[in-house]
Regions:
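Conserved ASCE P-loop ATPase motor domains encompassing nucleic-acid-directed helicases/translocases
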Residues: 1-85
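Flexible, glycine/threonine-enriched loop-and-boundary segments that flank and lead into catalytic domains
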Residues: 1-15, 19-28, 209-213, 229-230, ...
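ASCE P-loop NTPase motor cores of helicases and related translocases
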Residues: 46-226, 334-395, 403
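Active/binding-pocket-proximal capping segment
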Residues: 34-38, 141, 193-196, 242, ...
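Conserved helicase motor core of SF1/SF2 NTP-dependent helicases
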Residues: 154-156, 163-175, 231-247, 251-516
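Acidic, low-complexity intrinsically disordered tails
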Residues: 1, 95-102, 106, 508-516
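Short linear interaction motifs
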Residues: 2-11, 112-118, 462
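Short flexible coil/turn linkers enriched for glycine and charged/polar residues
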Residues: 37, 127, 436-439
Length: 516
């Protein structure tokens, strides 16, 4: 039976398909439809619970991490046994944050060598070692990763792909397939799918219980590239199964998970950017456990040191004024736009012609995680932009459509209010987690909280530099921040809080102030 419930405004991170449990922890129902804006949820209830009417439910799905634990224990036992003194090991190089070790050639760039050529050369010459690659917003790290995977396949190597989620794995595999098709190359790809995921065109599917079959496909070369989560690669049967393993979004992939999967490969390539979103956390852990593999390698640096890995210094997304802010605040001034981006700009808006940063102060009080005053300001901004046009990096002039805008907010409660007002216009609204990897003509970041002391998750969340980076770097031409001016005057008690506040304050210093 399908039961419909209404719920009051609240932070909701559930999704369709999630299983719900009442306070006693027993299985109650599964979400079939969820409308966060209207506060309605439809749930499918089994016969045994057909007459049960709980007043509150929660979702908690525990995934066993035993294979990862066992892999790390095997690694630790070997480390305690011989200390890897004579062994060439990607796992040890990762843990020790060693420089990439090559068989023959130099790690430094050769004269006239492009970044892609260097990345491919170094990857093919790795001596059971690691190659970290940091790619800022719009730098093309997925495209580069696909180029490297194709080169590995051409060299006869067995290739694995892993990431924090099935979707990220699929995105990289899709890029490999698209490039291979354009080049006329035959690349066979497979994936160990999630539980309820349907088979995908052009991808050999394996279910979660078919890891052995998937690994056999690598051995007999019926599959050149295999994608799977850490649970696939951490299994003992996967040890030594691939010559090179790619970890995509390694800035969100914990060091512990990376060490667990490393025994599966000869060499390890880590693609990502620790300056964007951090690894998602679903529980309380000891301090330091959540550090990502790339963050560990960076060792406190904002950008990849030249002797530790590769830094992708060009963005193909951000117009010069937006890139200047992003580069200064997050990338040690090392990120630059390609020349074609100088022509990207908004036109025919009457107020926002050109490219750049815009600060929209909105006075309000007493709001913690949602602000109607900001919703109204965002609505006016959206209407102005939808009546304008923009010029892309190829000089093509076009009208700004709803799909050319993104509206970002830190809290789901504020997202719901914004969506209720903007859904009819077709403009996408969400948290930064939804939009990482996406791009648009202009982005609007609405911060919702009236005063720093009101922030529900404290300064670390509301002023997060990672989230500010992702939010403001979605827009090709322009980034708007809509917020209470009181957020510019937090009561900082630590150097870290001063650093967090500096991100927003620096944006405002470089931005044009506008009133709606």
């Amino acid at each position: 039976a399908i039961h419909r419930y209404r719920f009051p405004p609240q932070e909701v991170e559930l999704k369709e398909g999630d299983k719900l449990r009442p306070s006693d922890g027993s299985h109650f129902a599964q979400i079939k439809h969820l409308d966060r804006t209207a506060g309605i949820v439809d749930v499918k209830v089994g016969k045994a619970a057909a007459e049960y009417r709980p007043t509150a439910v929660f979702h908690c799905e525990v995934v066993s991490n035993v294979p990862l634990q066992e892999s790390i224990i095997r690694f630790a036992e070997r480390l305690l046994g011989d200390g890897f003194r004579d062994a060439r090991s990607a796992a040890w190089d990762l843990l020790a944050s060693n420089r990439p070790r090559l068989r023959s050639g130099p790690f430094a760039a050769r004269d006239g060598e492009s970044l892609a050529e260097r990345a491919i050369r170094v990857m093919l010459d790795l001596d059971h070692s690691i190659l970290p690659i940091q790619g800022p917003p719009g730098s093309g790290k997925t495209y580069l990763g696909a180029q490297m995977i194709r080169a590995a396949v051409r060299a006869g190597l067995r290739v694995g792909v892993t990431a924090q989620s099935h979707q990220v794995i699929q995105n990289l595999i899709d890029a490999v397939r698209e490039q291979a098709a354009e080049a006329g190359e035959a690349v066979s790809v497979g994936r160990v799918l999630s539980k309820d995921e349907p088979p995908l065109d052009g991808v050999t599917p394996f279910r979660s219980g078919e890891k052995g079959k998937a690994l056999d496909a690598l051995t007999d070369r019926s599959v050149h590239v295999l994608g799977g989560t850490a649970w696939v690669w951490a299994s003992e049967e996967a040890e030594g199964s691939v010559d090179v393993l790619f970890i995509d979004e390694a800035g969100q992939f914990s060091l512990g998970h990376a060490l667990a999967v490393a025994p599966a490969c000869g060499s390890l390539v880590l693609l990502g950017d620790p300056q964007q979103l951090e690894q998602p956390r679903k529980a309380t852990h000891p301090d330091g456990v959540g550090v990502s593999a790339l963050t560990h390698i960076l060792g406190g640096h904002e950008t990849m040191p030249d002797d530790r890995g590769l830094f992708m210094p060009e963005t193909r997304r951000l117009a010069p004024p937006v890139c200047e802010f992003t580069s200064e605040l997050f990338y040690d001034g090392r990120l630059a736009p390609i020349p074609a981006l100088a022509q990207q700009r908004i036109v025919d808006s009457g107020r926002f012609d050109g490219a750049g940063l815009y600060w929209v102060p909105v006075e309000h009080r007493g709001n913690r995680n949602a602000a109607d005053e900001e919703v109204e300001a965002v609505e006016r901004l959206v209407d102005t932009l939808l009546g304008a046009g923009w010029i892309d990096d190829r000089g093509r002039r076009r009208r700004i459509e709803p799909g050319d805008l993104r509206v970002v907010a830190p809290y789901n409660a504020h997202v719901n209010r914004l969506a209720a007002r903007l859904d009819a216009r077709g403009v996408q609204v969400g948290t930064v987690d939804r939009f990482q990897g996406q791009t648009c003509a202009a982005v609007i970041y609405s911060m919702a909280t009236s005063d720093p002391a009101d922030a529900p998750r404290g300064m670390d969340f509301l002023y997060s530099l990672n989230r500010l980076n992702v939010a403001t770097s979605r827009g090709r031409c322009a980034a708007f921040i809509v917020a209470s001016p009181a957020l510019l005057e937090p009561e900082c008690r630590t150097p870290r809080q001063m650093q967090l506040a500096n991100g927003l304050c620096r944006f405002v210093e470089k931005a044009i102030e506008v009133r709606t």
